[in-house]
């Protein structure tokens, strides 16, 4: 194994993960604003563009679109949840503000890979 191969593998491993190969999904979203540690070990920053998802890999990035107003934001998955029936993703307060559903508390969203490789539209 060459030093160049090892360096290339290390660089690839450090790149932000995309939810590659993931399908577009639609469902409920809510928001939360804790300051405790997330499943990834980092402290939750309520204003960061982050989210909790039950199965997407930690560190992956997804585009979330609010289906009621078509606003979108790219978030990084850094936590696990939500654990409420009918909810697919829990967004940080900052992401929810950008999506325009703070006062409602929840909304219906489309979740797709941030790289645009999603396979369908929920609208």
Regions found by a protein language model. Give the residues of each.
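Secreted/periplasmic proteins
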Residues: 2-123
């Amino acid at each position: 194994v060459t030093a160049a191969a090892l360096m290339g593998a290390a660089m690839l491993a450090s790149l932000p993960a995309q939810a590659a190969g993931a399908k577009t999904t639609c469902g409920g979203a809510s928001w939360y604003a804790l300051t405790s540690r997330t499943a990834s070990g980092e402290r939750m920053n309520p204003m960061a563009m982050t989210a909790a998802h039950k199965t997407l890999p930690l560190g992956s990035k997804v585009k979330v679109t609010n289906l009621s107003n078509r606003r979108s934001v790219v978030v990084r998955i850094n936590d696990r949840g939500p654990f409420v029936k009918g909810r697919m993703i829990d967004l940080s307060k900052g992401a929810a503000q950008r999506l325009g559903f703070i006062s409602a508390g929840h909304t219906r969203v489309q979740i797709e890979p941030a790289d645009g490789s999603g396979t369908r539209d929920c609208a």
